[in-house]
A protein has these predicted regions:
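Short secondary-structure boundary/hinge segments and terminal tails
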Residues: 61-62, 124-126
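FAD-binding subdomain of flavoenzyme oxidoreductases
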Residues: 116, 121-122, 128-167
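Glycine-rich N-terminal segment of FAD-binding domains in flavoprotein oxidoreductases
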Residues: 18-118, 132, 137
Length: 167
């Protein structure tokens, strides 16, 4: 099946921040694959549309819904795969929509954990990176969440992907 903007799951809905202080109506796209995300981004760029990306919607201050900057939202909830646990190098490869709670369950099966563990079962990797969250007492010993990232693939508005690695 050919993928185009019409084949990507989407809906008009009322979205709310985690603390329910921010609400807005939005067109929400739910890409299931990287190529669907690329199609959405290219369309939005071509048509000069502003948008906001969200994952778990756990931001206390409304950042998870864009605080009325745009009425187009791209939800990463379906881009949530735990791709690999590399035991030799102590590295986990996941997509941005992966929930911290799900990752911790898989890590526990392999006798691993994470240095920075934010509270809340719906917090996603993408949100944790975007907010550079900290876990209770972890920032004193290990730094913030961003300090544990070894590499990051970022898709830009034009659909191109760039890898950023720790120096």
């Amino acid at each position: 099946m050919k993928i185009n903007l019409n084949t990507v799951e989407s809906e008009f809905k009322l979205i709310e921040s985690w603390n329910l202080t921010h609400k807005q109506k939005a067109l929400v796209y739910y890409p299931k694959e990287i190529k669907e995300l690329r199609i959405i981004l290219k369309y939005l760029k071509k048509n000069k549309k502003t948008f906001f990306i969200k994952s778990g919607s756990c931001s206390y201050d409304g950042k998870s819904i864009g605080v009325k900057k745009s009425n187009i939202v791209i939800s990463l909830r379906n881009l949530s795969k735990l791709i690999e646990i590399n035991k030799k190098n102590n590295i986990v490869n996941v997509q941005a929509g992966a929930k911290i709670a799900d990752i911790l369950l898989e890590l526990k099966k392999n006798n691993f954990s994470m240095f920075a563990i934010p509270g809340g079962e719906h917090i996603t990797i993408g949100g944790a990176i975007a907010a550079n969250v900290i876990g209770k007492d972890s920032s004193q010993n290990f730094g913030a969440f961003g300090d544990t990232i070894k590499s990051l693939n970022v898709m830009f508005h034009d659909g191109s992907i760039k890898n950023f690695e720790e120096n």
